[in-house]
Amino acid sequence: MSKSDIIEMQGTVLEALPNAMFEVELESGHKILAHISGKLRMNFIRILPGDKVTVELSPYDLTRGRITWRAK
């Protein structure tokens, strides 16, 4: 899967789940499960409920994603 296949969307974190998983509500209204990308994990970026985030989705599974950015 190339970088051009990835779908980027904005959303809001609703809930922090175990194992660094988060429930995120996208701007379209859909709710997905998302995990933190490696760069956010390495730099100890804290993500809390209510944070605005950018999520990458695979076209193969639109119910799971990867959090790549937390808005300031």
Swiss-Prot record:
Keyword terms of this UniProt record: Cytoplasm, Initiation factor, Protein biosynthesis, RNA-binding, rRNA-binding
Residue intervals of the S1-like domain: 1-72
Xref: InterPro entries: NA-bd_OB-fold, RNA-binding_domain_S1_IF1, S1_domain, TIF_IF1
UniProt GO cellular component terms: cytosol
Pfam family, one: eIF-1a
Location within or outside the cell: Cytoplasm
A GO MF label: rRNA binding
UniProt main location, coarse: cytoplasm
CDD domains for this protein: S1_IF1
HAMAP family per the UniProt record, alphabetical: IF_1
Self-association state and partner proteins as the record states: Component of the 30S ribosomal translation pre-initiation complex which assembles on the 30S ribosome in the order IF-2 and IF-3, IF-1 and N-formylmethionyl-tRNA(fMet); mRNA recruitment can occur at any time during PIC assembly.
Protein name per Swiss-Prot or TrEMBL: Translation initiation factor IF-1
Organism ancestry: Bacteria, Bacillati, Bacillota, Clostridia, Eubacteriales
